[in-house]
Regions:
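Sec-dependent bacterial lipoprotein signal peptides
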Residues: 1-16
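N-terminal leader/linker segments that initiate helical-solenoid repeat arrays
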Residues: 18-81, 89, 96
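Long C-terminal extensions of eukaryotic subunits of large macromolecular complexes
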Residues: 19, 293-349
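Short helix-capping/linker turns of helical repeat alpha-solenoids
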Residues: 49-56, 89-93, 98, 105-106, ...
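Short coil/turn linking the two alpha-helices of tandem helical-hairpin repeats
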Residues: 61, 65-72, 99-110, 136-146, ...
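Structural signature of tandem alpha-helical TPR/SEL1-like repeats
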Residues: 72-81, 108-119, 145-155, 180-192, ...
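TPR/TPR-like alpha-solenoid helical repeat scaffolds
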Residues: 98-106, 171-177, 210, 238-249, ...
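TPR/TPR-like (Sel1-like) alpha-helical repeat modules
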Residues: 222-234, 241-251, 255-279
Length: 349
C-alpha cells in the first residue's frame, strides 16, 4: 500500500488530535532488538481481496483520479460510500483511502481520531504489514496515542520484517544515514532498501543504485535504475538517459555508468523521464519498460513514443460502475447504510 499521502494526512490531523484522549497500544516487546534482517515481500502477508469489494474500490479510485484533474466536492460522498463498504469487506487499500478522506475532512466521521485508529488497528489485527507502519507514524506524531519515538521505531521494524516496502525504506534509510563508519548497520540498511526496491519502491531502487556505483558495481547500478524507472522514478530515467549519452571529461564522474553511447536509448529514457516528472502527482509507472527500452545487449524494438500508463490516463475509461443492487446487498450484510456506506443509525453531517 502506497503511504506517501498518509504522511501528509498525519500532519494535517495532528493538531486535531491535540487534547483528545490518548489510546494505549501494544508495546511490541516481542520485536527483537537485533539488527539482522531477512528480505520478505509484503505480498506474502496480504489477504486475497474480495472481488466485489475490489470493484467498489476500483471505481472509487477512478473517481479520485478525476478529482486530481478537476476537483468536484460532489464526488466525495460517492467516494466515501464505496470506500466504506469495501473497507467493511477487509479491503486494505480502501481502508487507507478512507482514512485519508477522514483526515482531510472530505468524509464524515463522528470521531475522526478514534475511527482512524480503529481502522489502523483492524489492519494490525489481521497481520497486514501496512497497519504496523501506519501506527508507527501515529506514534511518532502523537496522533491519538502517546507520542513515543522508540515505540514508533518498533512498529516500523515490525512492518519491515513483515515485508512493507515503505517501512523497509524508512528503517533502511535510518541505518544507512549512520554512514559507512558503522559498517554493520549500514550494510543491513542497504539490504532493506534493496528489498523495498524489488517490491516497487522507486526511491529505494534509485538509492540502492547509487550504492552500487559507490561499490563500483555499475552493471548492478544500471539494473536498479531500470527497476526504479519501472516503478515511476524520473530521477532513475534521467540517470539512464545521461548514461547512454555522450560521456565527456566534464560529465564523466556524474553520468558514466559504463554504457556505450546510444542516442535512441537516451531519447527514449528522456521522453519517459518527462512523463514521469510531469505526471508525478498521479503516480505513473512503466511496468512494460523492458519492452520499450531493454538494457543492452538486447536490441531496441519499435516504439510509438507513449507509455501505456499515459495512454490509459488520457483515455480515462471508467471501470464498471457497481450497481445499486450490489451496493445495497453488500452494505446491508455489514450493517451499513447503502446510501452512504456509514453505520446504520450514524449521525449524518
Amino acid at each position: 500500500v502506497t503511504k506517501s499521502r498518509l504522511f501528509a494526512l498525519i500532519l494535517t490531523l495532528s493538531l486535531a488530535a491535540c487534547g483528545a484522549k490518548e489510546r494505549s497500544v501494544p508495546d511490541l516487546k516481542n520485536v527483537e532488538e537485533k539488527l539482522a534482517f531477512s528480505c520478505v515481500y509484503e505480498k506474502a502477508h496480504l489477504p486475497k481481496l474480495d472481488e466485489q469489494a475490489d470493484q467498489l474500490y476500483r471505481y472509487a479510485r477512478w473517481l479520485y483520479k478525476n478529482q486530481l484533474e478537476k476537483e468536484d466536492p460532489l464526488r466525495y460522498p460517492e467516494m466515501e460510500r464505496y470506500y466504506r463498504i469495501a473497507t467493511a469487506y477487509g479491503h486494505y487499500k480502501a481502508n487507507l483511502d478512507l482514512r485519508e478522506m477522514i483526515g482531510r475532512g472530505t468524509a464524515w466521521s463522528a470521531d475522526p481520531v478514534k475511527e482512524t485508529l480503529d481502522l489502523t488497528q483492524d489492519l494490525i489485527d489481521r497481520g497486514i504489514p501496512g497497519g504496523y507502519y501506519d501506527m508507527g507514524r501515529y506514534l511518532k506524531a502523537g496522533y491519538g496515542v502517546k507520542q513515543d519515538e522508540e515505540l514508533a521505531n518498533r512498529y516500523y521494524r515490525k512492518a519491515a520484517d513483515l515485508g512493507n516496502p515503505e517501512a523497509q525504506y524508512l528503517v533502511g534509510d535510518k541505518l544507512t544515514n549512520l554512514t559507512i563508519a558503522h559498517p554493520g548497520p549500514f550494510a543491513i540498511g542497504n539490504e532493506m532498501k534493496k528489498c523495498a526496491a524489488e517490491q516497487g519502491h522507486g526511491k529505494a531502487a534509485v538509492e540502492y543504485g547509487y550504492h552500487m556505483i559507490y561499490e563500483e558495481k555499475l552493471t548492478e547500478a544500471v539494473s536498479f535504475f531500470q527497476l526504479a524507472t519501472k516503478w515511476g522514478d524520473p530521477t532513475a530515467a534521467l540517470n539512464l538517459g545521461n548514461g547512454f549519452g555522450r560521456i565527456t571529461t566534464e560529465n564523466k564522474q556524474r553520468n558514466d555508468l559504463g554504457l556505450q553511447q546510444d542516442d535512441e536509448r537516451q531519447r527514449r529514457y528522456l521522453l519517459i523521464m518527462g512523463v514521469l516528472s510531469d505526471y508525478s502527482y498521479a503516480h505513473p509507472s512503466v511496468p512494460e519498460l523492458d519492452e520499450i527500452v531493454p538494457l543492452p545487449p538486447a536490441k531496441l524494438p519499435p516504439w510509438d513514443g507513449k507509455i501505456q500508463w499515459l495512454k490509459d490516463h488520457e483515455a480515462n475509461i471508467a471501470p464498471p460502475k457497481p450497481s445499486e443492487a450490489l451496493l445495497e446487498k453488500l452494505a446491508k450484510a455489514k450493517g451499513l447504510d447503502p446510501k452512504t456506506g456509514r453505520p446504520l443509525g450514524a449521525e449524518h453531517s
